[in-house]
A protein has these predicted regions:
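Hydrophobic alpha-helical membrane segments of integral membrane proteins
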Residues: 156-160, 172-175, 185-187, 310
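Membrane-interface alpha-helices at helix entry/exit sites of multi-pass transporters
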Residues: 130-135, 149, 153-154, 164-179, ...
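Hydrophobic alpha-helical transmembrane segments in multi-pass integral membrane proteins
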Residues: 308-310, 321-342
Length: 380
């Protein structure tokens, strides 16, 4: 019996030792895990700090954009075989009445654009008069061309709409929705031109494919984006929360609002197509079929929007020349067409400049610095 007790005692000691060892192992593992987490956070912080330390000044960004525009514009003459003297000759023979009509239509489109944006902003809880929204749009056009830093047209629209309200996020989402609806209709127009135009099938596949795929992607994914984000990213994901629980969610819930916005966008883009037709008629380019305007104008607009350049200058001239020569237009009048369109946008920007000065929309240096640093909420 004593032997059995001794055996049990020894077993108990062994179990005690094993338990102690287990506790030591758990503590060691916990310490190791903590150390690994600390090291991971340290490395993550170091990487983040390194990324944040890489800052490109606004002046450098602006110089880079100007350089891109200058190179693209100059390459038209160096490699595009464009005779500048012929382009000037075509410009001097332009019909001024058609150009005046194009300019009037272009200016008038700003009022419709402002009304569309007003509807989207009101849904997000930001109510301004139509006159104010028109002024904000004109000032935005001015900022796009003459102040092409981070304080661009869209930033300025967000700033003026939210000023004094503390609702910069609401303003941002309204501008983003305004942009998105416009781009969606641009893709739709280009696709309809390709599919329904008599010569759409003869266009290069490298032109047709991105337009058609982009249109399918926009109209098949965008309407269901919040639910798709929740399903694939999870409800707690930042993107899911922004789409489902932020002021932006109204644009998926109010289908009547978005149908109205899309309808206004269709009318707006039709006006821009008419502007392009008027410029073509002013230059005597009567051989361009109407359906083709629905293809090349949206394509040029999207390229000018996504390409890093000085307000799209350079890339637009290349694009206009490319698309018009595809339609059988000589290079010289094609370039003249591009320059005429640049002149239209520049004159509209000058009108925006008058609104900016006479409407007392000047931004102080302190406000400009905050906008460029991204601390927009501090402005309200």
């Amino acid at each position: 019996m004593m032997a059995n007790q001794g055996t049990l005692l020894e077993k108990g000691k062994a179990d005690s030792v094993d338990t102690d060892s287990l506790e030591i192992d758990v503590e060691s593992l916990t310490h190791m895990e903590s150390q690994l987490n600390t090291d991971s956070k340290t490395r993550q912080f170091s990487v983040t700090a390194a990324i944040n330390s890489i800052k490109i000044s606004e002046r450098t960004k602006l110089r880079a954009k100007i350089a891109v525009s200058v190179v693209l514009f100059a390459s038209l003459f160096l490699f595009g075989k464009v005779d500048l003297s012929k382009s000037i000759e075509v410009a001097l023979k332009a019909n001024p009445w058609y150009l005046l009509a194009a300019f009037a239509l272009f200016l008038g489109s700003t009022f419709l654009n402002a009304y569309r944006w007003k509807l989207l902003a009101s849904a997000a809880g930001l109510n301004q008069s139509l006159l104010k929204m028109v002024q904000f749009c004109f000032v935005g056009v001015f900022f796009n061309l003459f102040l092409p830093s981070t304080v661009g047209g869209d930033f300025s629209r967000c700033y003026y709409l939210s000023k004094g309200t503390g609702k910069y996020a609401h303003a941002f989402y309204s501008v983003l929705a305004d942009r998105t609806v416009g781009i969606a209709v641009l893709f739709l127009f280009a696709s309809l031109g390709i599919l329904l135009g008599p010569g759409g099938g003869g266009l290069p596949i490298q032109l047709k494919l991105p337009i058609l795929l982009g249109t399918v992607g926009i109209f098949s994914v965008l309407p269901f984006l919040p639910s798709l984000a929740k399903r694939f990213l999870g409800p707690e994901n930042w993107v899911s929360r922004q789409l489902n629980n932020s002021p932006a969610s109204i644009y998926w819930h109010d289908r009547g609002l978005m149908a109205t916005a899309i309808g206004l966008s269709v009318i707006l883009q039709l006006i821009f197509v008419l502007c392009h037709v008027a410029v073509g008629l002013a230059l005597g380019l009567t051989n361009i079929p109407l359906w083709y305007y629905f293809v090349f104008y949206p394509s040029v607009a999207v390229l000018g929007f996504i390409t890093p350049s000085f307000n799209g200058i350079g890339i637009r001239e290349w694009a206009y020349t490319y698309f018009l020569t595809l339609a059988g237009v000589d290079r010289a009048p094609a370039l003249t067409y591009a320059i005429m369109w640049l002149g239209l946008t520049t004159m509209s920007s000058l009108v925006g400049g008058l609104v900016y000065v006479l409407g007392h929309f000047k931004i102080s240096k302190a406000e400009k610095d905050l906008m460029e640093s991204g601390r927009m909420d501090s402005l309200n």
